[in-house]
Amino acid sequence: MKTYRRQIREKILQALYTLELRDTDIESAANWLLTKEIQEDPNAMKFFNLLLKNIKEHREEIDQYIARHTFNWDMSRIAIIDKNILRMALAELLYCEDIPPKVSINEAIEIAKKFSSTDKSSKFVNGILDAIFNELKAEGKIHKNGRGLIDHSAIKLQKESETPE
């Protein structure tokens, strides 16, 4: 089974970019961009719908994280592509429990290399995401399961309960 996650991320980025330039809704913009293969794959569509929903529903919160970590930049001055790559990656970090943080960050960097207009964009995206990820981790706001991230606290509790007293 082929995975379409990179393609989906790219299509969502294109839809987010379209939203910045036109008066349309995100679902229409994104659905118009999807390939037939993605539309016919239930797992791909599940990921597409989840990521799109989380970006849309949590955009204000996500933008606050970005604004806090781009001290020298007003949100309006950040390149549209970079800003939307950050939004997409943060939606994954915060709300897609089965995607490891490193995958979300690496995908964002690779997409920045492909779509951004300067070589510095991927470094900018990496630096901002790394800082936000460290903050989220310190605050205990990263909740991953399955393949996403091992819950070390649960393992520690399990080992402690197995230790004879």
Swiss-Prot record:
Q: Note the SS bond partners.
A: none
What keywords appear on the UniProt entry? RNA-binding, Transcription, Transcription antitermination, Transcription regulation
Q: Return one Gene Ontology term, BP aspect.
A: transcription antitermination
Q: What SUPFAM superfamilies does the entry give?
A: NusB-like
A GO MF label = RNA binding
Instruction: Report any Pfam family annotated for this entry.
Output: NusB
| Listed InterPro entries | NusB-like_sf, NusB_fam, NusB_RsmB_TIM44
Question: What top-level branch of life does the organism fall under?
Answer: Bacteria
User: Function, please?
Assistant: Involved in transcription antitermination. Required for transcription of ribosomal RNA (rRNA) genes. Binds specifically to the boxA antiterminator sequence of the ribosomal RNA (rrn) operons.
> PANTHER family this protein is in?
ANTITERMINATION NUSB DOMAIN-CONTAINING PROTEIN, N UTILIZATION SUBSTANCE PROTEIN B-RELATED
Cross-referenced NCBIfam families: nusB
The entry sums up its family as follows: Belongs to the NusB family.
What name does the UniProt record give this protein? Answer: Transcription antitermination protein NusB
Q: Which organism is it from?
A: Chlorobium phaeobacteroides (strain DSM 266 / SMG 266 / 2430)
